[in-house]
Amino acid sequence: MVAVKEATNVGKITQVIGPVIDAQFPSGKLPRIYNALKVQGRNSAGNEVAVTCEVQQLLGDNQVRAVAMSSTDGLVRGMDVVDTGAPISVPVGTGTLGRIFNVLGEPVDNKGPVPAGETFPIHRPAPKLVDLETKPQVFETGIKVIDLLTPYRQGGKIGLFGGAGVGKTVIMMELINNIAIQHGGVSVFGGVGERTREGNDLYNEMIESNVINADKPEESKIALVYGQMNEPPGARMRVGLTALTMAEYFRDVNKQDVLLFIDNIFRFVQAGSEVSALLGRMPSAVGYQPTLGTDVGDLQERITSTKEGSITSIQAVYVPADDLTDPAPATTFAHLDGTTVLSRGLAAKGIYPAVDPLDSTSTMLQPSIVGSEHYDTAREVQSTLQRYKELQDIIAILGLDELSEEDRLTVDRARKIERFLSQPFFVAEVFTGAPGKYVSLADTIKGFKAILAGELDDLPEQAFYLVGDIEEAKAKGAKLKEG
């Protein structure tokens, strides 16, 4: 959404280099950095051209260099460039819910214009230090494995690692559903440089699972902002900021708790790297932009808790060639409060959500924050699962009978814990037929303490699979014994 105030400040294109253009303006009328420019004119076929660009550099000699937010096909030297006098601004508020937008805040779902309302510029300062909520607070998700072993921080940033088909999208949708029902919050999804098909699938799955109400979009729980792989690097570089700006409105004006999903944070860095060389910057390590730390920091520092509300961010992280020392993921890790790692092995066993209880981490899992009961239970669960992992080779070669009585008990409890970490999801009801369960943190701790204490050693392990709290497991166990 780029409003042209008055066509008073008009320049001319002097050079087009792929997605980057140079434009010359009258003396004393140079646009500011980050101002939106609108290229107007007709291409060689006589068709109207309307391309929005963002000023990145002032070159001297009354020239600026700008990055295009859409294809520069058809642009030629001498075309008019209008300075809009302001940065790219996007619609915000409840009118954005249930809709799909591009980087400029224009709806791309063929459902007509967004109801007229407020707009915010995508470049905004991070909240002031005095406005921040510095007391660490756990963000309860209702998902047992996350709340117990990798608790999320309210206003924190979590990296979501996982390959294709292990359930990233389903976990995202469940979190969106739970924050809407339990916290009265909303979500914003930023699709940064991912496949168009995935964006389309996500939208359709959200309609199926009632996260989006196609008939009454205002009753939806999420706004979607897409800048896919086929978009120019300028759009992929800025679409994350568009999504973040929409989330900031819900936090600062509506005073809500917001979930911001960014899929994929690596593509944001990659787009910046593509543009950097065209802007004439000297590349740094592995060919990345020299401003890598600043680019990531500018985005991440705006994602935080204030005294009014919070933005909790879940960011899918692609690790190039599985190299965690690559500058892009390494820079991202510095900002994360926790990591949720999805395991293909668990998914193959049918244990969903397939969160790896030993690989996933959280800075919140400290006795001073979550309390000693939660901390001790989580650590005991992890040590039991770790011991089970160590014993698996012996079991595979010699069988269970060769284990000591104590180890056999550990294996038995670990298998129950593994199954109890699974849970039926609300958004998967239409596929599984099992009603979804939201499990409070207190019930989660109570359940795992009972398993660890040996109170449920007599129940079959199948009783713990895909249930909510421990009472449900007991009831299922009693039914299995009867049957």
UniProtKB/Swiss-Prot annotation:
Keyword Oxidoreductase: no
Topology of the protein relative to the lipid bilayer: Peripheral membrane protein
Role according to the record: Produces ATP from ADP in the presence of a proton gradient across the membrane. The catalytic sites are hosted primarily by the beta subunits.
Sites where the protein binds ATP: G162, G163, A164, G165, V166, G167, K168, T169
Swiss-Prot/TrEMBL keywords: ATP synthesis, ATP-binding, CF(1), Hydrogen ion transport, Ion transport, Membrane, Nucleotide-binding, Thylakoid, Translocase, Transport
Molecular function in Gene Ontology: ATP binding; ATP hydrolysis activity; proton-transporting ATP synthase activity, rotational mechanism
Descriptive protein name: ATP synthase subunit beta
Enzyme Commission number: 7.1.2.2
Subcellular location: Cellular thylakoid membrane
PROSITE patterns: ATPASE_ALPHA_BETA (PS00152)
Top-level lineage group: Bacteria
Protein family membership: Belongs to the ATPase alpha/beta chains family.
Predominant location category: membrane
Class in the EC hierarchy, top level: translocase
Binding partners and assembly: F-type ATPases have 2 components, CF(1) - the catalytic core - and CF(0) - the membrane proton channel. CF(1) has five subunits: alpha(3), beta(3), gamma(1), delta(1), epsilon(1). CF(0) has four main subunits: a(1), b(1), b'(1) and c(9-12).
Catalytic activity: ATP + H2O + 4 H(+)(in) = ADP + phosphate + 5 H(+)(out)
Cellular component terms (Gene Ontology): plasma membrane; plasma membrane-derived thylakoid membrane; proton-transporting ATP synthase complex
Encoding gene (name): atpD
